[in-house]
């Protein structure tokens, strides 16, 4: 806070019962920082006055950092569709006694699998 100025009293010689008086000055401290210095003035009327003012400013600064972790899981599904098709052909022949020849027969895969 600021320190108050000191007042000075007037010095009179016109009467013997006039005394010098001194005044103690106080000041109100500023908040938040260092106060200024006070100034005081005195007038010579047998009293002294002084005023002191103090101002202060303060600044608070802060920095912060934050870290975070994010994890996630996921599943994926898929379908596969396919068809396999084919044809197999073959010939079969046989000979039965009696002089009768059997004609070749074409066999497909569907007939062979039965």
Curated annotation (Swiss-Prot):
Record PTM: Phosphorylated with a circadian rhythmicity, probably by the double-time protein (dbt). Phosphorylation could be implicated in the stability of per monomer and in the formation of heterodimer per-tim.
Subcellular location per the Swiss-Prot or TrEMBL entry: Nucleus; Cytoplasm, Perinuclear region
Region annotation (28 X 2 AA approximate tandem repeats of G-[TN]) ranges: 30-87
UniProt key word Cell cycle: no
Composition-biased stretches (Low complexity): 80-91
Residue stretches of each Sequence repeat: 30-31, 33-34, 36-37, 38-39, 40-41, 42-43, 44-45, 46-47, 48-49, 50-51, 52-53, 54-55, 56-57, 58-59, 60-61, 62-63, 64-65, 66-67, 68-69, 70-71, 72-73, 74-75, 76-77, 78-79, 80-81, 82-83, 84-85, 86-87
Residue spans of biased composition, Polar residues class: 105-114
Residue ranges, compositional bias (Gly residues): 30-79
GO terms for biological process, alphabetical: rhythmic process
Keywords linked to the UniProt accession: Biological rhythms, Cytoplasm, Nucleus, Phosphoprotein, Repeat
Entry comment, domain topic: The run of Gly-Thr is implicated in the maintenance of circadian period at different temperatures. Deletion of the repeat leads to a shortening of the courtship song cycle period, and thus could be important for determining features of species-specific mating behavior.
Subunit: Forms a heterodimer with timeless (TIM); the complex then translocates into the nucleus.
The protein's role, per its UniProt record: Essential for biological clock functions. Determines the period length of circadian and ultradian rhythms; an increase in PER dosage leads to shortened circadian rhythms and a decrease leads to lengthened circadian rhythms. Essential for the circadian rhythmicity of locomotor activity, eclosion behavior, and for the rhythmic component of the male courtship song that originates in the thoracic nervous system. The biological cycle depends on the rhythmic formation and nuclear localization of the TIM-PER complex. Light induces the degradation of TIM, which promotes elimination of PER.
Name of protein: Period circadian protein
Organism of this sequence: Drosophila orena
Encoding gene per record: per
